Amino acid sequence: MNFNLRQAIMANIQGSNEQEVEATIVDAIQSGEEKMLPGLGVLFEVYWKNCNEQQKDQLCEQISQGLQ
């Protein structure tokens, strides 16, 4: 059996509205559970693929500042 975690996560969140996406992110961060990390990674990938270069630069700058 070939299980693709990314596809499973996408199938689970496909069609989510803005409030549902935010609730998913907030819940994942507040729970602090490592099992939520793949889902956040998929959400990040979706965001990244839909950003222009300026948005990507701003995001990387914000993350970099947050890591200081």
UniProtKB/Swiss-Prot annotation:
It comes from the Bacteria. Keywords: Sporulation. It is found in: Spore core. Pfam families: SSPI. Induction: Expressed only in the forespore compartment of sporulating cells. GO terms for biological process: asexual sporulation; sporulation resulting in formation of a cellular spore. Belongs to the SspI family. This is Small, acid-soluble spore protein I.
